[in-house]
Amino acid sequence: MLKIFLLTLLMISYTTIADEGMWEPYQMEGLKKELRATGYKKNISNVSDLFKHPMNAIVSLGGCSAAFVSDQGLIATNYHCIERSYLQFNSNAENNLFETGFVARSKEEEKKSAPGSRVYVTLESNEITEQVLMGVKDETADIERAKIIEENIKQIINKCETTDEIECRVRSFYSGETYKLEKVLKIKDVRLVYAPPAYIGEYGGEIDNWMYPRHTGDFALLRAYVSKDGSSEEFNKDNVPYSSDSFLKISSRGVDDGDFVMIVGYPGRTNRLLTFNEIKYDLEFQFHEVVKFLKRGIDLINEHSIDEDGSKLKYRGLKSGYENYYKKISGQINGAKNFKLLESEKENWNNFLRFVDKEASSEDKQYLEELLKLIGKEQLESRSRSY
């Protein structure tokens, strides 16, 4: 299951030191020393409690992070996050918002989003590992284990989703070691307020994408609406702006050298705990297959998209997504090669194996051996299902 949790990327700009990685809010209390050393001076609870300001101002668009920036439902997010559901949906040959950009000078001018566009506000997050694994025993076969877990999750979600505006998700962390139940409010009426033209929002294109430094106006503004009684409803002219529990204030001062910077959001996943075998598999096989698949998709769109029938505009968002991921994976392959990543990871892995051989119990050694066998089996099956 996709591992999704709150990202906190801690960076300090006055030196070359950067403490980075994905951290859940509850882990912040254990990082007090590191936070203080990097310049964080406020109360740790400000970044450890998901349901207090400023953390509860952060929301998800179901694939992108965003934040409330006013008490009138105004949301700041990235330009690339609104290309398909907002710009492409509201564009045509005569009114191409990619070329002109868009600004609503009043709430009445704001544009509705494509069907299915949502803002997700987290209401609760609780660990439910015991409930998910209820009925699973050490001797339970893998297929039976999966069936039990699937049925338990269905029952948990059915019990949690009491109304249409509530969505509940069970998230798996650390490959099934921990499970959490997220209860979110689905805001169904989301409108476009502002987006720059593409020459600002996509400045540098795929040449600058994933590169540093980058100078792109990759931002946009949306607004969330609910019915007058506060319930979440689809687009309706009588809906009113959603009033969030808190919102972020945008500083006009900017940042100076030495300022503490923290990024908070809802990312996809982290793969920092992969074994050497998994890293090697990705870099020597899986990533190359993904690149070939994406390149084929980009070529097909270019081949069959022509201005006359408006297909270029219709497929612009999809093509942009393909190109973005293509650049990312290609860059990871080249970066790993340039920095001799496999060589260094092999050395780290050998050091780990020597430690295991010397310090681990026979039971732990057996667990590691079984894990590596399962990884090898999974990789063989993955090759057979390759793109």
Regions found by a protein language model. Name each.
Residues I4-S13:
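Sec-dependent N-terminal signal peptides
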Residues T15-Y387:
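Terminal presequence/propeptide segments associated with secretion/organelle targeting
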